[in-house]
Design a protein with these regions (language model features):
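Short, acidic, Ser/Thr-enriched surface-loop or helix-capping motifs
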Residues: 28, 93, 108
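A solvent-exposed, acidic/Ser-Thr-rich amphipathic alpha-helical stretch
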Residues: 24-73, 77
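Short acidic-aromatic low-complexity motifs
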Residues: 1-32
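A short hydrophobic beta-strand element
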Residues: 77-88
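Short beta-strand edge/turn micro-motifs at domain boundaries
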Residues: 101-120
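Short beta-strand segments enriched in hydrophobic/aromatic residues
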Residues: 27, 88-90, 104, 120
Length: 120
């Protein structure tokens, strides 16, 4: 798939909250996930490989007490990259309710996402 095709499929699945399917279908086995440096204070770290990325997602989900809503914008494509705006309204365990917004940038090689990087 081209970057545009990967981005379109990502968007279709994201609009219905199918994050597991996105990872299963669109990610390379050796993909990496990069968080901003300040995310470590929130218990979020970088991950390499799909097993580690899935565990990172599970750990984040365990921190969520209640999800009130969320969004993912349409992708913007540039070369082998696409980016989306994302956000969620959630109550984190022991931290109360908050609105989180970020930009996510994805790198595509040989029809698969090989890197995700988050900015917030």
């Amino acid at each position: 798939m081209t970057t545009q095709e990967v981005a379109n499929r990502f968007n279709d699945l994201a609009q219905t909250g199918q994050w597991d399917t996105i990872q299963k279908e669109l990610y390379a086995d050796n993909a990496v996930s990069i968080e901003p440096a300040h995310a470590a204070a929130m218990g979020m770290s970088n991950a390499e490989g799909m097993d580690a990325i899935r565990k990172k997602g599970e750990a984040f989900n365990q921190m969520v007490e209640e999800m009130h809503g969320g969004y993912c914008t349409a992708p913007v494509i540039g070369g082998n990259f696409f980016s989306v705006g994302m956000g969620m309204d959630c109550t984190m365990k022991g931290m109360g309710r908050s609105q989180m917004d970020e930009i996510a940038v994805y790198e595509v090689k040989e029809g698969k996402i090989v890197k995700e990087q988050f900015f917030f």
